[in-house]
Amino acid sequence: NAYIDFSKMTASVVAVESDVIRNGKRLIGYGFNSNGRYAQSGILKDRILPRLLNASKADLRSEDGNNLDPAKAWKMMMSNEKPGGHGDRSVAVGTVDMALWDLVAKIEEKPLAQLLAERYGTGTPEADVEVYAAGGYYYPGKGLVELQNEIRRYLDMGYSSVKIKIGGASLADDLERIEAVIAIVGNGSRLAVDANGRFDLKMALAYAEALEPYGLRWYEEPGDPLDYQLNAIVAQSTTTPIATGENLFSCIDTQNLIRYGGMLPSNSVLQMDPVLSYGVVEYLRTLAMLRRHGWSWRRCVPHGGHQMALHIAAGLGFYKHVALP
C-alpha cells in the first residue's frame, strides 16, 4: 500500500487444543493475526501463553462448566499487564482470543455468527453481509489499464463496491486512478479510497478537497490514526465520509476517536479490527461504549478480510465487511 510492503509481513498462528472429543478427535480452535501487523511469537511465548497454560480449569471454564469462557481467559492473558501502551500486545492477545472463540463455537456446535447473535445480538445472525473488495495496490509496472482489469475481475466475482489505495503516487496520478476505477464501477459511491495514514494535515486536506466532487464511499485514514485533531479537521472540511479505526487497539482508543476525531454517527465508518485489538472480548466492550455514545453498530466495518471478522459482522449486525480477493 502507500506505507508498507506486505511481502515483508509475517503472521502468528495459534492452535488451542481441548480435552473435548468429537468423532474420536480433540476439538481444536485456530487463530491468526490480521494483515498489517507482524507475528507476535515473542509476546505469545514469553507472556500470554504461559499464563493460560498455568491457569486452573476454574480460571477458564464457563459458569455452567460446559465450555470455555473467553472473558475469563482474556483476564488471565492480561494479568500483570499495565493499561495503555498497547503496541503489539493487543495483536498477541487477539490472536489467542480468535482461537478461543473458534473453539467455543465448535464445542457449542454452532457457527460463530449464530453464537454471537444469541449471546450479544438479536438472536439471529444477518442472512447477508455486504462485502467489498479491497485492492488497487501499487505495483511496479501497474498502470491504469492493469488497475481497471483488476477492478473488472472483482466485479466479475460478484463484488459491487471496491476500495483502492491512495498516497503512493502524486495527487494528480491518484485522481487519474480514481477516475479510471469509476469508469469501471459506474459511480463514486461504489468506490472507497485508503491513504493508510500517510498524509500530514496539508496533504490530507488537499486530497479531501480533490476527492469531494467524486462522491466516494469513504476517505480512509487520511493521517496518523492517533492524530485525532488532524482527523477532525479533515472530517469538517469535506462531505466525503471519513473511515478509520483499524489501527486503534482498545476501547479507550476508539472512545477518544469519537470524542475528539470529528467522526459523525450519521456517516463515518469505524474499522476496528477485532483480532488486532485484543479480540472479541475487548471488541464487545468497544461496541457497548459506542452504543452508550449514540453510535449504531452498523457504522462498524471490521478490518481484517478474514472469516472471524465476517462472523462478527453477521452475528452482531454490522454495516458491511472487507474482503481481500
Report each predicted region and the residues it spans.
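Short, Gly/Pro- and small/polar-rich lid/capping loops
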Residues: 1-12
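Flexible C-terminal active-site loop/helix
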Residues: 11, 286, 302-325
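Short beta-strand elements
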Residues: 12-20
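Metal- or metallocofactor-binding catalytic centers and their adjacent structured scaffolds
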Residues: 20-107
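Active-site mouth loops of central-metabolism enzymes
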Residues: 86, 127-148, 166-167, 195-200, ...
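N-terminal small/glycine-rich loop or linker at the start of catalytic domains
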Residues: 112-142, 177, 182, 186-188
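Catalytic core of soluble alpha/beta enzymes
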Residues: 164-302
